[in-house]
A protein has these predicted regions:
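Rossmann-like dinucleotide-binding domain for NAD(H)/NADP(H)
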Residues: 90-91, 211, 215, 220-222, ...
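Short glycine-/small-residue-rich Rossmann-like dinucleotide-binding loops
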Residues: 51, 193, 198-201, 227-228, ...
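Phosphate-binding beta-alpha-beta segment of Rossmann-like dinucleotide-binding domains, i.e.
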Residues: 86-142, 154-161, 307-311
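An N-terminal-biased, well-structured beta-alpha scaffold segment characteristic
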Residues: 1-91, 188-190, 210-216, 349, ...
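NAD(P)-dependent dehydrogenase/reductase Rossmann-like domain
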Residues: 261, 281-404
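Short, Asp-centered acidic motifs that coordinate Mg2+ and/or phosphate
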Residues: 44-45, 67, 194, 222, ...
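Rossmann-like dinucleotide/phosphate-binding beta-alpha-beta segment
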Residues: 1, 11, 131-219, 235
Length: 404
């Protein structure tokens, strides 16, 4: 079996897959769709980061693909509906780089409020300008966090430790940490000295922040976005920076990001007290190693056992492997009678079901079975031919798999 790892994924992942018996190919960059279609035909596991787009067309060129690992938080570039249609499980890591993002956010808050980057630019330009004008302590300032998930809540802890008052807004009713307090979206914008966005990539957040939202912010406030590029109207932000309503900004994500190292353009370039970074908030060596270990382990476990815990598109099913039993898994459309149909095929062959679990998620149903004897070719064909079956898989030992 083959694993294809794109975008310079941590070598930790390669080691996990090689230990599991995979042939591993790696690339340092994302691949354009046509090139990816050429390479993916014999691939069982595809590893990506945020630049790769796995479309329906790509999946149609990947008959052997069993699972995709997004070695990042977001899975915006993966067509999950098409993955469901092809029986491809998708996994990501929503945790491992949260600390890295929270730390750089706090660092940028301090850099903005102290005008460090503006002073740095003057010094590199040969101008000494020792002044306290426009430079402040963060202690006592109000930080407004929009999106109080894993990253937002960790930033809340760090900011409070630095002496800041923390308020937040979230679309769900989440528990506040420390002394942080929940407010409406509008109230956060009106009260915060610094507004920072940490929202997810769902459609509801597209164009979340534009002209109207910037007008609601306090005069001489700061703005940060380390979430998704499509969340913010950068032209509107540039206008408010030039007018002095917003006195500093930090952005790590952009509406149109290059696929690899190369030219970049933004209306925010050249503006004073604006920090621009190339989508690196979560890119620390520690985070990438942890993500590499976590996602590759989830993928290897899925291939070896069929367990789908933490999949972003499949139902979450898990059965402990028991020596002496034979495991099969069945991906199907969520239709009445599927469990009965599978059990009937097994019963007709006098096969005993030792353990089973079935769950559904939207249009997808997923079942794991442990049975008392191996599947022969006739049984494999019968199970694969059950109406509404998407994919059937049987494993006689953890690393000896057959597919139908």
């Amino acid at each position: 079996m083959k694993a294809l790892l794109l975008e310079n994924i941590s070598g930790v992942a390669r080691a996990v897959f090689e230990k599991a018996g995979f042939d591993v190919e790696t690339t340092a960059t994302a691949l354009p769709e046509e090139k990816l279609r050429e390479k993916i035909g014999d691939v069982s596991i595809l590893g990506i980061r945020s630049k790769t787009h796995v479309t329906k067309t790509v999946l149609e060129s990947a008959p052997n693909l069993l699972a995709i690992g997004a070695f990042c938080i977001g899975v915006d570039g993966v067509d999950r509906d098409a993955c469901n249609q092809h029986g491809v499980a998708v996994f990501n890591d929503p945790h491992s780089n949260s600390r890295s993002v929270a730390e750089i956010a706090l660092g940028e808050i301090i850099m903005l409020v102290r005008r460090v980057f503006a002073a740095n630019s003057e010094m590199h330009g040969g101008h000494w300008n020792k002044t306290a004008a426009g430079s402040h302590e963060v202690r006592g300032l109000t930080l407004g966090i929009v999106g109080y998930g894993r990253i937002g809540s960790q930033l809340s802890d760090l900011a409070e430790a630095a002496g800041m008052r923390v308020i937040f807004s979230d679309v769900t009713d989440v528990l506040a940490r420390g002394n942080a307090r929940s407010y409406s979206f509008r109230e956060v914008l009106e009260q915060a000295d610094i507004v920072t966005l940490h929202v997810d990539g769902k459609t509801r957040n597209r164009n979340l922040f534009g002209e109207e939202e910037f007008r609601l912010m306090k005069p001489s406030s700061y703005f940060m976005n380390l979430s998704r590029g499509f969340v913010v109207d950068h032209e509107a932000l540039a206008r408010h920076l030039k007018e002095g309503k917003i006195v500093g900004a930090a952005l790590d994500v952009f509406p149109d990001e290059p696929e690899s190292s190369g030219p970049f353009s933004s209306p925010l370039q050249g503006l004073p007290n604006v920090i621009l970074t190339p989508h690196i908030a979560g890119s620390t060596e520690e985070a990438q190693q942890n993500i590499g270990q976590f996602v590759s382990s989830r993928l290897a476990e899925y291939i070896e056992t069929g367990n789908t815990m933490l999949s972003v598109n499949f139902p979450h099913c898990q059965l402990e492997l028991v020596p002496g039993s034979y495991r099969l898994s069945h991906i199907h459309h969520n239709m009445p009678g599927m469990l009965l149909a599978i059990n009937k095929v097994l019963a007709e062959r006098s096969i005993n079901i030792e353990r089973q679990v079935l769950d559904t998620r939207g249009e997808i149903g997923y079942a794991i079975y442990d049975i008392n004897r191996p599947c022969d070719e006739v049984l494999m064909r019968r199970l694969g031919d059950i109406p509404h079956t998407i994919r059937f898989r049987v494993a006689e030992t953890p690393r000896s798999l057959q597919f139908a």
